[in-house]
């Protein structure tokens, strides 16, 4: 029977390890089902040479769910894969798996087995150049940490990129390190699309990763999307066709190829690919969201073709597109309640359906969220302000939320839209009442934000004079 002293001694040793239990992977409880689904999908459908890490992550997720026996099975699979995939460097590559074994056994109260794995780690770390007893600084472990962070969501992407950068310092031409760095760069670029002045940087890393991994269809389709972002759609389509011709990782390739086609305007082709992928991964949050966006795009196409006046069959088609989009957006947020962008798309689609009650409920959920990206919160306030202005006819609430969007000082196109929307609303109010003190002050504020200081001073002075006149009239009485 173990003593408390043994327990503390083992725990102190465990804290020194480099593994999923010590990497501070930020995973919310309501994100766990989606994370587990994505991990299982990757194991089954992503053809990659880098599968050991994903089994380690699955073990960690199983542990968090209280399924330690299942966690041990996943670690055993990781250990077996290590022998097949990295036999020449299995000892160093096994450090993360052995460290996770030690932690799981510790949590199960099996201290002797935990200590046995600690001993295995210590034996590998015994090098004259290594000052640590239970840890080793090496690019392979930096890479494993990067993969784990990358899989655990947007709040971890910067740290993931830093891990892959550190790994590449030790081996510039390593295909796996290059792949991880390129994917983390691509994800970070996606976060910053709305940021004014942001210089996207993933194109060169993606080109480098594709050159080092010429058979990787997943990387090629990401490169195709990035080229499309940069206005190089023709070159992007060449990589896309290569990815689609390759049988590897087809479920993943279909997801991103569909995005390429949707943005190109080939919505039917996009839907065809997404439905094929959905047959393989029916709970995929990304797929449901992308399908919803396709139906939204089809709705917009019909509206534009009918100049916003759809009748008869066109009206029926639009109603069908709205229902289908709502179904898929609802599926996305059901499987991942923290998916802010899908919630926002769902709220807008409820508005299209005329279901203001559901739209309000969805916006209230959104207003309680804490998105990783500030621009997302700006967009939540902007869209809610528009809902209040145009559907609920509440100018007061609209102004409040335009101001809340503007108050988030991250420079972005969304913030600019919020400023312009506030200006339009205030000018409309002043047309009805040129002596509206609040509107005069707000217009001065808008011009100040735009850098038009002369106009700002003019409206501030008019507001001050109006306030002074009002105060004098109150003093003088009737």
From Swiss-Prot:
<feature type="repeat" description="TPR 1">
    <location>
        <begin position="52"/>
        <end position="85"/>
    </location>
</feature>
<feature type="binding site">
    <location>
        <position position="290"/>
    </location>
    <ligand>
        <name>RNA</name>
    </ligand>
</feature>
<dbReference type="GO" id="GO:0140610">
    <property type="term" value="F:RNA sequestering activity"/>
</dbReference>
<feature type="repeat" description="TPR 10">
    <location>
        <begin position="437"/>
        <end position="470"/>
    </location>
</feature>
<feature type="repeat" description="TPR 7">
    <location>
        <begin position="305"/>
        <end position="339"/>
    </location>
</feature>
<dbReference type="GO" id="GO:0005829">
    <property type="term" value="C:cytosol"/>
</dbReference>
<protein>
    <recommendedName>
        <fullName>Antiviral innate immune response effector IFIT1</fullName>
    </recommendedName>
</protein>
<feature type="repeat" description="TPR 5">
    <location>
        <begin position="218"/>
        <end position="249"/>
    </location>
</feature>
<feature type="repeat" description="TPR 3">
    <location>
        <begin position="139"/>
        <end position="174"/>
    </location>
</feature>
<keyword id="KW-0802">TPR repeat</keyword>
<dbReference type="Pfam" id="PF14559">
    <property type="entry name" value="TPR_19"/>
</dbReference>
<dbReference type="GO" id="GO:0009615">
    <property type="term" value="P:response to virus"/>
</dbReference>
<keyword id="KW-0399">Innate immunity</keyword>
<keyword id="KW-0677">Repeat</keyword>
<feature type="repeat" description="TPR 2">
    <location>
        <begin position="95"/>
        <end position="128"/>
    </location>
</feature>
<comment type="subunit">
    <text>Component of an interferon-dependent multiprotein complex, at least composed of IFIT1, IFIT2 and IFIT3. Interacts (via TPR repeats 1-4) with RPL15. Interacts with STING1/MITA; could disrupt STING1 interaction with MAVS or TBK1, acting as a negative-feedback regulator of virus-triggered signaling. Interacts with EIF3E; this could be an alternative way to inhibit translation.</text>
</comment>
<feature type="repeat" description="TPR 9">
    <location>
        <begin position="378"/>
        <end position="412"/>
    </location>
</feature>
<dbReference type="GO" id="GO:0003723">
    <property type="term" value="F:RNA binding"/>
</dbReference>
<dbReference type="Pfam" id="PF13432">
    <property type="entry name" value="TPR_16"/>
</dbReference>
<keyword id="KW-0694">RNA-binding</keyword>
<dbReference type="GO" id="GO:0005737">
    <property type="term" value="C:cytoplasm"/>
</dbReference>
<keyword id="KW-0051">Antiviral defense</keyword>
<keyword id="KW-0832">Ubl conjugation</keyword>
<dbReference type="InterPro" id="IPR013105">
    <property type="entry name" value="TPR_2"/>
</dbReference>
<dbReference type="InterPro" id="IPR011990">
    <property type="entry name" value="TPR-like_helical_dom_sf"/>
</dbReference>
<feature type="binding site">
    <location>
        <position position="147"/>
    </location>
    <ligand>
        <name>mRNA</name>
    </ligand>
</feature>
<feature type="binding site">
    <location>
        <position position="259"/>
    </location>
    <ligand>
        <name>RNA</name>
    </ligand>
</feature>
<feature type="repeat" description="TPR 8">
    <location>
        <begin position="340"/>
        <end position="373"/>
    </location>
</feature>
<comment type="function">
    <text>Plays a key role in the innate immune response as part of an interferon-dependent multiprotein complex, recognizing and sequestering viral RNAs that lack host-specific 2'-O-methylation at their 5' cap. By distinguishing these RNAs from host mRNAs, inhibits their translation by competing with the translation initiation factor eIF4E. Could also prevent viral replication through its interaction with DNA replication origin-binding protein E1 of several viruses. Causes the translocation of E1 from the nucleus to the cytoplasm and can also inhibit its helicase activity in vitro.</text>
</comment>
<dbReference type="Pfam" id="PF07719">
    <property type="entry name" value="TPR_2"/>
</dbReference>
<feature type="repeat" description="TPR 6">
    <location>
        <begin position="251"/>
        <end position="284"/>
    </location>
</feature>
<dbReference type="InterPro" id="IPR019734">
    <property type="entry name" value="TPR_rpt"/>
</dbReference>
<keyword id="KW-0597">Phosphoprotein</keyword>
<dbReference type="Pfam" id="PF13424">
    <property type="entry name" value="TPR_12"/>
</dbReference>
<keyword id="KW-0391">Immunity</keyword>
<keyword id="KW-0963">Cytoplasm</keyword>
<feature type="repeat" description="TPR 4">
    <location>
        <begin position="183"/>
        <end position="216"/>
    </location>
</feature>
<comment type="similarity">
    <text>Belongs to the IFIT family.</text>
</comment>
<feature type="binding site">
    <location>
        <position position="289"/>
    </location>
    <ligand>
        <name>RNA</name>
    </ligand>
</feature>
<dbReference type="GO" id="GO:0045087">
    <property type="term" value="P:innate immune response"/>
</dbReference>
<feature type="binding site">
    <location>
        <position position="336"/>
    </location>
    <ligand>
        <name>RNA</name>
    </ligand>
</feature>
<dbReference type="GO" id="GO:0051607">
    <property type="term" value="P:defense response to virus"/>
</dbReference>
């Amino acid at each position: 029977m173990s003593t408390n002293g043994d327990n503390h001694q083992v725990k102190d040793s465990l804290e020194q390890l480099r593994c999923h239990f010590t990497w501070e992977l930020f995973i919310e409880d309501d994100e766990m089902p989606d994370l587990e689904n994505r991990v299982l999908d990757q194991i089954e459908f992503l053809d990659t040479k880098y599968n050991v890490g994903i089994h380690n992550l699955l073990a960690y997720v199983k542990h968090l769910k209280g399924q330690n026996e299942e966690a041990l099975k996943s670690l055993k699979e990781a250990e077996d894969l290590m022998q097949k995939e990295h036999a020449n460097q299995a000892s160093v590559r096994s450090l993360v798996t052995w460290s996770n074994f030690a932690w799981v056994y510790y949590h199960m109260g099996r201290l002797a087995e935990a200590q046995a794995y600690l001993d295995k780690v210590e034996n590998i770390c015994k090098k004259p150049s290594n000052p640590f007893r239970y840890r080793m600084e090496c690019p392979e472990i930096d890479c494993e940490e990067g993969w784990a962070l990358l899989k655990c969501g947007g709040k971890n992407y910067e740290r993931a990129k830093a891990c892959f950068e550190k790994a590449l310092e030790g081996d510039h031409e390593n295909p796996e390190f290059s792949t991880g760095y390129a994917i983390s760069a691509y994800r970070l670029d996606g976060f910053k699309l709305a940021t004014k002045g942001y210089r996207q940087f993933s194109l060169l890393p993606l080109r480098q990763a594709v050159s080092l991994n010429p058979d990787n269809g997943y990387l090629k389709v990401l490169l195709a999307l990035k080229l499309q972002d940069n206005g190089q759609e023709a070159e992007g389509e060449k990589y896309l066709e290569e990815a689609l011709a390759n049988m590897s990782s087809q479920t993943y390739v279909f997801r991103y190829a569909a995005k390429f086609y949707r943005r190109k305007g080939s919505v039917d082709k996009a839907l065809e690919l997404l439905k094929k992928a959905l047959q393989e991964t029916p709970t995929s949050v990304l797929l449901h969201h992308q399908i919803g966006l396709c139906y939204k795009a089809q709705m917009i196409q019909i509206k534009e073709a009918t100049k916003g006046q759809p009748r008869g069959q066109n009206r029926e088609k639009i109603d069908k597109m709205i229902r289908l989009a709502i179904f898929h957006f609802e599926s996305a947020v059901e499987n991942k309640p923290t998916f802010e962008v899908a919630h926002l798309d769902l709220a807008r689609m409820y508005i299209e359906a005329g279901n203001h009650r559901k739209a309000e409920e969805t916006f209230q959920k959104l207003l309680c969220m804490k998105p990783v990206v500030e621009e997302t919160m700006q967009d939540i306030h902007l869209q809610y302000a528009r809902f209040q202005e145009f559907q609920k006819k509440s100018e007061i609430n609209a102004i409040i939320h335009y101001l809340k969007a503007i108050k988030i000082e991250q420079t972005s196109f969304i913030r600019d839209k919020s400023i312009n929307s506030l200006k339009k609303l205030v000018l409309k109010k002043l047309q009805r009442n040129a002596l509206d003190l609040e509107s005069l002050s707000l217009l001065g504020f808008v011009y100040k934000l735009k850098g038009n200081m002369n106009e700002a001073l003019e409206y501030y002075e008019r507001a001050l004079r109006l306030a002074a006149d009002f105060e004098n009239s109150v003093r003088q009485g009737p």
